């Protein structure tokens, strides 16, 4: 079983979170977003085989922990690879108002990096 844990260091306590998860991988897998207090923001699983495109999760919440974690588990895989983008959300004056993370996950050897896609964004304020 392959698993990987990521620390989303640029999303700070009090940020308003939003996320989206989708998959077109053949293997089953589980994605979880949680914090250092034990609060789980979401857990989603792809349980069926096949490569049809599936939306697995979307939602939002306020982040009140100190560290935010994302875990990926793929039982049939021996190695998880990833391509990660991390960008600031800025206002019209180039002041940082949030953070975006995009995770493109590879579960096997074809290196297409489209097996799981996870988008997590946090804004310093909501509304």
Task: Mark where each language-model region is.
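Extracellular distal adhesion/interaction modules in secreted or cell-surface proteins
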Residues: 1-98, 102-104, 114, 121
């Amino acid at each position: 079983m392959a698993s990987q844990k990521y620390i989303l260091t640029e999303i700070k306590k009090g940020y308003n979170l939003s996320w989206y998860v989708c998959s077109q991988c053949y293997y089953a897998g589980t994605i979880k977003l949680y914090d250092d207090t034990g609060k789980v923001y979401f857990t989603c699983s792809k349980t069926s085989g096949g490569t049809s495109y599936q939306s697995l999760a979307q939602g939002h919440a306020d982040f009140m922990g100190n560290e935010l974690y994302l875990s990926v588990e793929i039982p049939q895989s021996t190695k998880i690879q990833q391509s990660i983008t991390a960008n600031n959300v800025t206002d019209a004056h180039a002041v940082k108002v949030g953070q975006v993370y995009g995770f493109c996950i590879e579960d096997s050897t074809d290196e297409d990096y489209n097996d799981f896609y996870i988008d997590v964004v946090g804004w310093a304020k909501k509304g």
